[in-house]
Amino acid sequence: CMWYDTPRLLCQLEIEYTDGSTELVVTDDSWKTTTGPLLHDAIFTGEEYDARLELDGWNRNGYKDSSWKKALLVRAPKGSLHAQLAPHEKIIRILQPVSCEQKDDSTYWYAFPEMISGWAHIKVQGNAGDRIKLRFVGEEKNDFGQVDLYTLRGGGVEQWEPRFTWHTFRYIEVTVSYTHLRAHETVLDL
């Protein structure tokens, strides 16, 4: 995140098995790291995701992570650590656009029925390396830097939605890098 310094993780997983036994998993020098498809995220301004960099199976048992680097132990941030309890974000309804206007060969303007906070779920088809830019615009026609970028993996229909951001908007300007891209669906998750 642009406002948080170097990315860090402090984690403690408390696992309780069905037989009643427990296991504690904590961050230490046995953890590994690598780059992936999420190139940038900022809660208020958006995400950049390159699907060509996805690591198939990385989250399944038996994945070969021999090329991954050991995570570095780093200094703790200043201040004291306190638990923060907050409700998780959840989808309460899904909106379809009320209109779509093609501005030129590569730009589309989607209008939604009201100003909302949420994110877009896209379903597209194109070639590896094709890019989609989603610019989220409010009623006053200002985007306040709210942009999501998605680079296609290629090879079929792809679906994507950001995981670490949400936007406040009424319109989405969608710009595609190539005119052969096919938008199958654009919906809003609120």
Regions found by a protein language model. Give the residues of each.
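Extracellular/oxidizing-compartment recognition motifs
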Residues: 1-182, 188
